[in-house]
């Protein structure tokens, strides 16, 4: 478990693993070279994560993320060229991962170019899949990621802008195929 993601305290880098006995030696060797230990203040603060007040606050955050995710998934389902079959179901984290498909690509018009154009035209940042995919398979240029951590209003505005932008982008792609 990683406290930083589970309790919305990014940067703390505090967590633990439950592993089979057969992996303890190998994981310990890796861990010793990656981290020395979590700072004492982080360890002490982490204890607060399990009290009732923190649990209630965490539930409010989780509900906010659920509502933002629902807004994004709903709005994406209404955009021509983005069907639900092209959306990886969000399972952990606070991101939606979308595959535009080979049919919506042209040389020089993948998701890196799309995300750049979207940022320039609509002032909204999505992340191209090339940041997450193995470059040997060329899947990153047809995928992109949307964060829903910004809240419902932010999600609604971003999706309104994307709904306006994406059809124009597809026309540009088609004219360059």
Predicted regions and their residues:
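Residue-level recognition of strand-loop junctions within catalytic nucleotide-signaling folds
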Residues: 20-21, 51, 99-101, 149-151
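PLP-dependent enzyme catalytic core of the Aspartate aminotransferase-like
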Residues: 117-126, 132-177
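Conserved core segment of the aminotransferase class I/II
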Residues: 1-66, 73-77, 164-166, 171-174
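Short beta-strand segments
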Residues: 1-2, 88-89, 95-99, 128, ...
């Amino acid at each position: 478990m990683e406290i930083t993601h589970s309790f919305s305290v990014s940067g703390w880098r505090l967590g633990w693993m439950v592993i089979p006995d057969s992996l303890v030696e190998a994981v310990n060797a890796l861990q010793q070279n990656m981290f020395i230990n979590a700072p004492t203040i982080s360890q002490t603060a982490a204890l607060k994560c399990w009290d009732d007040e923190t649990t209630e606050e965490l539930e409010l955050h989780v509900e906010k993320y659920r509502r933002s995710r629902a807004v994004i998934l709903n709005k994406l389902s209404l955009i021509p060229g983005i069907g639900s079959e092209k959306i990886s179901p969000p399972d952990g984290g606070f991101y939606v991962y979308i595959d535009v498909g080979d049919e919506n690509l042209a040389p020089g018009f993948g998701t890196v170019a799309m995300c750049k154009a979207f940022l320039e035209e609509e002032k909204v940042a999505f992340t191209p899949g090339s940041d997450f995919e193995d470059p040997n398979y060329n899947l990153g240029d047809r995928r992109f990621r949307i964060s829903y951590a910004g809240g419902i209003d932010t999600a609604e505005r971003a999706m309104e802008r994307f709904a306006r932008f994406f059809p124009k982008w597809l026309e540009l792609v088609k004219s360059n195929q």
